[in-house]
Amino acid sequence: MTSRTRNHRMPTLLLSLVLSAFFCASLGAEETREKEKKSAVQAIVGATVLPVSGPMVRRGTVTWKDGKILEVAAELAAPEGARIHDAEGLYVCPGFVAVVAMGVGIETSSGNIGNGLDPWDRELTIALANGITTLQVLPAPFFGGFGQDGPLYGGSNSAVIKLTQGDLEGMLVKEPAMNYFSLPRRQIELNYFLLRERFKQAKAYLAKRAEARAKKATEPKLSSSLKLYVAVLENTRPTIFSPANNHEVKIVLSLSREYGFDAVLNEPKDAWMMAADLAAANVPVLVKSRGPDFDFNTTGPLFEKGQMAPVRRPAAFVRAGCQVSILPYRRGISLSGLAGRDLATLHVDAAFAVRGGMSNEDALKAITLNPARTLRVDDRLGSLEKGKDADLLILSGHPLDYRSFVLKAFINGKLYYDREKSRIYREIPLTGDK
């Protein structure tokens, strides 16, 4: 190598070393800033706080760090150095939990939902702007239960996700979230018999598996046709049915008692007449407060058969002691056609339930803590309590007031929606009482 070549390469080598040191220092500084940002205590002060799990807190303060709530109290001084969010005259409540949603935040029609998460789905912003921070998502436009014309089948392809838009980290909460069954309305007794037979086979399999494990022997092979039934009997997640009438409700209760699994009823329209039985069996219900399944021109005989206006059903279940979660009329987000009847108006559906006799407290619980309990994630979500995830909303008014807007939405302690910086609802003036 000539001296001229060496002389040319020396500046290049020095430049490379300088640039490497610069980028390493920049990356280190960025990591430090991110770490400091994540670990900083944040506080909302001066708000009317609705914890859901307890009474309203006036002039309340909510503090959190590293994505977890530290304290919720009245007139609590924010820790020194905390990042303050002034909420004087505003409301704070937990993020809404949609107990069932279709296709939001995912790009998959089947298979593993965790591998098909889409944090850049534009519908996430719309949902966040309307207060939803968590939902159970199913990929297909079908929610299992009775009332289908196809064969007996079921599945567990569902997941609980958070709407961390643009951020895959922390998005997946739980997968699978539920089991669900389709039991056709035709030949109901035959399918009931088949269902019981498969549960018997699953129970026998579990007994053989337990015996093999006790002897440290090879476990028996599990048939693919029994996997779902075994999962139901293991009861690691609830199982959901959609009964079309009270006869089918009784079938579900019978199976649940006999085999010891936790059942959930999706839209049991007439079951308000046997709501006390559901409450005694600790069976949660998912109900709509709006819908076309009621004819206001009907008279006595139809009412005697159990017809009740959808707006009154949630309150009827609550009065009996049932755990109620509110469903929107549509389980996706519509960007065209008839608006105001989908996930974007979940809080309005809760307000309709109040019109039908529910208290404000129960209605808010029906879109926060109750869905979290049904999905078995209430140890983290659904209320503002010490140690739970900092998923919360700052609103211009009471969350069930149709005039209220979400001003900020936090998930895992991070700000994911800011009305002032978003195109969603920013141009609409705030009105009404704060």
Short names for language-model regions:
Residues 2-14:
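Bacterial N-terminal signal peptides that target proteins for export
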Residues 128-263:
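Polyanionic/metal-chelating signatures
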Residues 12-24:
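Bacterial N-terminal signal peptides
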Residues 113, 213-310, 325, 373-375, ...:
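Active-site core of metal-dependent hydrolases
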Residues 34-40, 49, 53-93:
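Histidine-rich, glycine-flanked metal-binding segment
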Residues 50, 385-429:
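C-terminal cap of metal-dependent C-N hydrolases
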